């Protein structure tokens, strides 16, 4: 009856098939089997990522189709239309959104933009690091009041001509000498070839009559004696270094001249050291 209904063409919707079963004493020779209902395909939920490649082998690619014909069993194809494949639209640039267009033409512009962003970020980080290091170093430096105490003001009118006076500056001995005209001419006439540490007398003074030196021997740090030695300047009693009136090493183991500190004349009779 089913085959007749299938072959009846336009009359198939109004035809119906009926059958009756009568219980008998004999058992059938062959047991009737009920065909198993095919299960719809199930997606593998163990896959951690959803992409076009991972879903291409599991989801049905064709739309929902139902086909029927004479002497042909009916078939149904299922299509999962609720699966959203990510396209990364929000993460791509406008130049590469079109998958059918080559991205080679815009590669230089995109690289330039990336380089620009990297350079700006690097400069910003370097500037921030520089400020942090500068503030850290400044926090360890001496404050303004400490620096003010590191300066000493000397009244030159208290030092007679030809004499040397010692002061204490930053924990070091400071020599201030008022030279005579003879001493000025004598030191200016010294040949630089005779000096171990060549330096002209005028390069060590701001006023020829005043010599300001740090009274520490450049050999091992002893304090020299003023108005002593073979050259009438300074003499170190520790190891016998002789300095002239300009503080230049002339004899002995000391390798360098006496150090000249920074100083400035505020008036004819006043000098500030430091």
UniProtKB/Swiss-Prot annotation:
Where it sits in the cell: the answer is: Mitochondrion inner membrane
**InterPro entries of this UniProt entry?**
bc1_Rieske_TM_sf, Globular_prot_asu/bsu, Rieske_2Fe-2S, Rieske_2Fe-2S_sf, Rieske_Fe-S_prot, Rieske_Fe-S_prot_C, Rieske_TM, Ubiquinol_cyt_c_Rdtase_Fe-S-su
* Processing and modification events after translation: Proteolytic processing is necessary for the correct insertion of UQCRFS1 in the complex III dimer. Several fragments are generated during UQCRFS1 insertion, most probably due to the endogenous matrix-processing peptidase (MPP) activity of the 2 core protein subunits UQCRC1/QCR1 and UQCRC2/QCR2, which are homologous to the 2 mitochondrial-processing peptidase (MPP) subunits beta-MPP and alpha-MPP respectively. The action of the protease is also necessary for the clearance of the UQCRFS1 fragments.
Q: Which reaction does it catalyse?
A: a quinol + 2 Fe(III)-[cytochrome c](out) = a quinone + 2 Fe(II)-[cytochrome c](out) + 2 H(+)(out)
CDD domains registered for this protein in UniProt = Rieske_cytochrome_bc1
A GO molecular-function descriptor = metal ion binding
How does the UniProt record describe the way this protein sits in the membrane?
Single-pass membrane protein
- Cofactor binding: number and manner: Binds 1 [2Fe-2S] cluster per subunit. Fe-S cluster delivery to the Rieske protein is mediated by components of the iron sulfur (Fe-S) cluster assembly machinery that reside in the mitochondrial matrix (including HSC20 and LYRM7).
What Gene Ontology terms describe where this protein resides (cellular component)? mitochondrial inner membrane; mitochondrion
Taken from the UniProt record, the cysteine pairs bridged by disulfide bonds within this chain are 222-238
List positions binding [2Fe-2S] cluster.
Answer: 217, 219, 236, 239, 241
A GO biological process held by the record: respiratory electron transport chain
Q: Which residues face the membrane's Mitochondrial matrix side?
A: 79-103
Record's SUPFAM superfamilies?
Answer: ISP domain, ISP transmembrane anchor, Non-globular alpha+beta subunits of globular proteins
Give the cofactors, semicolon-separated: [2Fe-2S] cluster
Q: Which Gene3D superfamilies match?
A: Cytochrome Bc1 Complex, Chain I, Rieske [2Fe-2S] iron-sulphur domain, Ubiquinol cytochrome reductase, transmembrane domain
Give the residue spans that cross the bilayer.
104-140
List the NCBIfam families hit by this protein, alphabetically: Rieske_proteo
- Would you identify the family this protein belongs to, as annotated? Belongs to the Rieske iron-sulfur protein family.
Q: What further note is attached to this protein's record?
A: The Rieske protein is a high potential 2Fe-2S protein.
**Name recorded for this polypeptide:** Cytochrome b-c1 complex subunit Rieske, mitochondrial
What is the organism of origin for this protein?
Answer: Theropithecus gelada
Biological classification of the source: Eukaryota, Metazoa, Chordata, Craniata, Vertebrata
Q: State which gene encodes it.
A: UQCRFS1
């Amino acid at each position: 009856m089913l085959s007749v209904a299938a072959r009846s063409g336009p009359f198939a919707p109004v035809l119906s098939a009926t059958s009756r079963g009568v219980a008998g004493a004999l058992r059938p020779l062959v047991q009737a089997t009920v065909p198993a209902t095919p299960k719809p395909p199930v997606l593998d939920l163990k896959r951690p990522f959803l992409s076009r490649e991972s879903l291409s082998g599991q989801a049905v690619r064709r739309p929902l189709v139902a086909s029927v014909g004479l002497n042909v069993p009916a078939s149904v194809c299922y299509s999962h239309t609720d699966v959203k494949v990510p396209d990364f639209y929000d993460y791509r640039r406008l130049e590469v959104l079109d998958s059918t267009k080559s991205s080679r033409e815009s590669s230089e512009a995109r690289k330039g933009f990336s380089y620009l962003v990297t350079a700006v970020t690097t400069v910003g980080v370097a500037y921030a690091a520089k400020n942090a290091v500068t503030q850290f170093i400044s926090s360890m430096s001496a404050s303004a009041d400490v620096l003010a105490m590191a300066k000493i003001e000397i009244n030159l009118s208290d030092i007679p001509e030809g004499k040397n006076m010692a002061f204490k500056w930053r924990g070091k001995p400071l020599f201030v000498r008022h030279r005579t005209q003879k001493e000025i001419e004598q030191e200016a006439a010294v040949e630089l070839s005779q000096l171990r540490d060549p330096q002209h007398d005028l390069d060590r003074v701001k006023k020829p009559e005043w010599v300001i030196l740090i009274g520490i021997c450049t050999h091992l740090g002893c304090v020299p004696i003023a108005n002593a030695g073979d050259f009438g300047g300074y003499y170190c009693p520790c190891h016998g270094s002789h300095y002239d009136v300009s503080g230049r090493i002339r004899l002995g183991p000391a390798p360098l001249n006496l150090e000249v500190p920074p100083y400035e004349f505020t008036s004819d009779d006043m000098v500030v050291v430091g």
